[in-house]
């Protein structure tokens, strides 16, 4: 190789090196300025991570619990726990139960028999609420909505409500689909009829309390309203005249219920069901009655308007065609004393009915 060519080769190598250095500098500069896109697989991973982060629920900022009316009945327990669940979600907290005594365990067991999914949402502490909890009053009147959003700025890990009952759809109705999914799986409800393509079940929800609902203060169920109300519902809800309409009656006084309609069958396991049978009295547990409503009741009639059990039969029902006797047309003590606001207690999509002066059923708007 001649001495003449060597400088040229060195010059060429130098040019290549300088080009490489300059190219690396440009790449780093554009990367730092965000002008260069990362490789496709990196972008896909980054976008996926951002989507996952945006769809993850926020981390709860603590627990929400409440004093519970442990000596009350099943439907009152359901109201309290579902409302605490709804409020906890709205306040970005985990619903919790502090077990104060053995009655709390009975409460939990009773609700779990019909809404097992609801209890799965709760953190259950096997001891009373501790001193670290911030206690706040809410809903001093059972059936008037008290907006819990006022507690949004409380940062305490444990927020404990000292109200009771929380009987308003407004505490949880935006989570209605989820609440209904908490109902236990269907079981064999026979000899009660199931809702299928060949029949229509008009569900009468009767919760007659012979202990206190006939005390002259609460409005209890009575035949003079039930019979015309049922006929009214049949006319409104029967979409196909060829369908067989059946009525299932549920309540706390089977003897009374069995006498309302001729040919009524008390649906015990050994009961003989004729093809012509149209009226059934349930002999199931309250939990199974609620589950039956969820899977089979196309229409529901609540004849004792302040009955919380009747309320839940309607709210959990399959068909969501719920009718109730207008409480303003009665002398029910809860309404008269101002502890129940109909707009807070009754779901707006439900139909309020009453008897006019001619004993004709009319819709109350």
Swiss-Prot record:
Top-level class of the enzyme under EC nomenclature: transferase
Example of a GO cellular component annotation carried by this entry: membrane
**GO MF annotations in UniProt:** galactoside 2-alpha-L-fucosyltransferase activity
Does the entry feature the keyword Ion transport, yes or no? no
Which EC number(s) does the record attach to this protein?
2.4.-.-
**Which terms are listed as keywords in the entry?**
Glycosyltransferase, Transferase
Organism, scientific name: Caenorhabditis elegans
Q: Which GO terms describe its biological process?
A: carbohydrate metabolic process; macromolecule glycosylation
Protein's recorded name: Putative glycosyltransferase C06E1.7
CDD domains assigned to the protein according to its UniProt record, in alphabetical order: Fut1_Fut2_like
Pfam families per the UniProt record, alphabetical: Glyco_transf_11
The record's similarity note reads: Belongs to the glycosyltransferase 11 family.
Q: Which residues cross the membrane?
A: none
